[in-house]
Amino acid sequence: MANSLLEGVFAEVKEPCSLPMLSVDMENKENGSVGVKNSMENGRPPDPADWAVMDVVNYFRTVGFEEQASAFQEQEIDGKSLLLMTRNDVLTGLQLKLGPALKIYEYHVKPLQTKHLKNNSS
């Protein structure tokens, strides 16, 4: 039953490959991680830590979360805040429906955090 629930949740995942802001390489690595490449587009800084609240809102609008994007504005989530968010913050703090919240965290917030950490650890 748990597997069928998860399959249903992930069945309608928005493809991060079509991000206008990021040039995303969705090639799966051996460990299951995803490579993400960055480029400046739509006037947003390439580093999410430099995003203003409206950059975050526009990012989520462009990746298919039009309804949910307003929650980031209401909670005043800028790039630095976005990079600090935990799974629990996204699932409960934004008061979003569970399905979209899971997708937002797993396919957008988490990869942005991972990319940011990689770029700033060297």
Curated annotation (Swiss-Prot):
Annotated SAM domain residues: 51-119
InterPro entries from the UniProt entry: PcG_chromatin_remod_factors, SAM, SAM/pointed_sf
Cysteines paired by S-S bonds: none
CDD domains: SAM_Atherin-like (cd09583)
PANTHER family recorded: ATHERIN-RELATED (PTHR12247:SF139), POLYCOMB GROUP PROTEIN (PTHR12247)
Protein's name according to its UniProt entry: Sterile alpha motif domain-containing protein 13
Organism name: Homo sapiens (Human)
Lineage: Eukaryota, Metazoa, Chordata, Craniata, Vertebrata
Gene name, Swiss-Prot/TrEMBL: SAMD13
